[in-house]
Amino acid sequence: MAKKVTGYLKLQVPAGAANPSPPIGPALGQRGLNIMEFCKAFNAQTQKEEKNTPIPVVITIYADRSFTFEMKTPPMSYFLKQAAKIQSGSKLPGRDFAGKVTSAQVREIAEKKMKDLNCDTVESAMRMVEGSARSMGLRVEG
């Protein structure tokens, strides 16, 4: 028989930098989970990732206080900022442009994010990436 799920917890943790300090420690501790067990498992799985890349993680919490976690791909804004070589998006998207990305970069980001997006084709994923780029104040060229 399957374990009874008592809840889910969504966090965004830097790759290889999970530690018991806030915000991870209190979020897991409130639910009675072993904080160090999560930190060690997460850091082991994110060793191959670039340091401090934000990794969204969904933790499934079971009634016996055990857990499993599923890692997602980094946020689209992270990839777009890297592609445009900027620190942050525009404060006034649509008026001020913070940078630009090419359609080749958009395709590359769409292919990386494909498994987390709710779309069937790369072209529809590219349209989602282009929309995110515009909302950040980035110009899409090409």
Curated annotation (Swiss-Prot):
It holds the Pfam family Ribosomal_L11. GO terms for molecular function: large ribosomal subunit rRNA binding; structural constituent of ribosome. SUPFAM superfamilies: Ribosomal L11/L12e N-terminal domain, Ribosomal protein L11, C-terminal domain. One of its GO terms (cellular component) is cytosolic large ribosomal subunit. GO terms for biological process: translation. It comes from the Bacteria. InterPro entries: Ribosomal_uL11, Ribosomal_uL11_bac-typ, Ribosomal_uL11_C, Ribosomal_uL11_C_sf, Ribosomal_uL11_CS, Ribosomal_uL11_N, Ribosomal_uL11_N_sf. Lys-40 is trimethylated or acetylated; other modifications may also exist. The keyword NADP does not apply. Gene3D superfamilies: Ribosomal protein L11, C-terminal domain, Ribosomal protein L11/L12, N-terminal domain. Keywords: Methylation, Ribonucleoprotein, Ribosomal protein, RNA-binding, rRNA-binding. Forms part of the ribosomal stalk which helps the ribosome interact with GTP-bound translation factors. Part of the ribosomal stalk of the 50S ribosomal subunit. Interacts with L10 and the large rRNA to form the base of the stalk. L10 forms an elongated spine to which L12 dimers bind in a sequential fashion forming a multimeric L10(L12)X complex. Belongs to the universal ribosomal protein uL11 family. This is Large ribosomal subunit protein uL11. The lineage of its organism: Bacteria, Pseudomonadati, Pseudomonadota, Alphaproteobacteria, Hyphomicrobiales. The gene is rplK.
